[in-house]
């Protein structure tokens, strides 16, 4: 029986120092029914030189200016032909056996298949495991979101819509809240899918994302009080994390997550 077609989309911009590791980690899966798509935001470094070295391995390569991460994600969806789609961006590394694990778990009955993701501290090398949330309430405190571990069906994107270009950073949380509210079904796949380095575009200064967080709670059915509660919960979480890390840079992660390494 032929395995399902899986689309992997790598979004990149000036990622010459990291993208080759991402590409190699995907290609080394040796998955027989892979649709690999590259969406580049008109990089000015050697990103495209690296991409072109593997050009025959990709189904689609797009290199042009975009309107932000959400716009790039939507381009990736539009250019994908797989039954499920995962975004494995240019700071991420797919772990061995990931695609086989998803193919084995796929049953055609769910909209979103969520695997585990390892978070790596690039300063210390410490890794911890993030187990995904499969329920996203109006105020999504304690919800874990890592698009590197999410395989979303093309049908789900067609039904629930793509990524809101009004959201600059937590666009994956916005999508999951919207999809959950509209009845999306989730399946947890207990397998380590990918590793990503903490400190990337969507894991930096919480204050830059205030407008986004207030917006997505309100648009997904919350009121102003709930929106501000969620935002200041995140602010307080960051504050507590900094305090705990006085006892060691990885101390807060050790308390929050199951150990991986």
Q: What do the PLM-derived regions correspond to, one by one?
A:
Residues 32, 40-49, 89-92:
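A conserved acidic beta->alpha catalytic loop
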Residues 85:
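Short aromatic/hydrophobic "clamp" motif used to bind/position activated sugar donors
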Residues 4-7, 35, 174:
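Cell-envelope/extracellular polymer assembly enzymes that use nucleotide-activated donors
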Residues 17-20, 45-53, 93, 97:
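Acidic helix N-cap motif at the loop->helix transition within catalytic regions
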Residues 1-28:
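N-proximal low-complexity "stem/linker" segments adjacent to membrane-targeting elements
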Residues 93, 97-127:
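Conserved donor NDP-sugar-binding/catalytic core segment of glycosyltransferases
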Residues 63-80:
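Glycine-rich, basic loop-to-helix element that forms the pyrophosphate-binding segment
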Residues 129-216:
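Conserved nucleotide-sugar donor-binding catalytic segment
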